[in-house]
Amino acid sequence: MNHIGVYDNILSKEECNKIIKYFEDSSWKERAFVTGNGSGTKEIQPKFKNGSNLTVRLSDCDKTMYNYLKEYILPALGKGLGEYKKKFPFMDHGLDAWSIEDGFNIQKFDGKEEGYFVQHCESCTSRNCNRMLVWMIYLNNAKCGTRFYYPTRDVKAKEGRLVLWPAGWTHPHSGILPNIGEKYMITGWYSFD
């Protein structure tokens, strides 16, 4: 059974462009980092992941992002998650309580020198082992996307497309390489409370 959910037109072109502008205008952007070392510290490792990142906290964001979250990001995630749960209804029965994680990342990968180059999963250390589901929304059309290795599946980066999948070791993934042009996305998680 395929546990990768793909939902198109979850955000409009205008909504995606507003989030991209928010990202580009932010003075809080930083180089993309990895935290898979188990300590939770941010490490810049361009051979693994190279690009730009903006971490946003649901509990502590500015008014502009708060409005984007309230008006369309969270409703879009709710809509997509509702569709995903139709395929996997057991998610609401027999599991411990779970909810959206406080933080998420807006990311940009620009050109063949940038991307997330290595296979990884989203729940691979004791620090993030409570993650159960990953959500990612592509903010623009790009000539690349995400590669899942088991099952083998490529998901093309398409503006407004939501992708949901299990966070664990069963779903290793990476960016499709080479990265051609600009690719913008938002990535976050649903975790056990």
Segments and roles (model prediction):
Residues 1-134, 138-162, 170-193:
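Fe(II)/2-oxoglutarate oxygenase catalytic core
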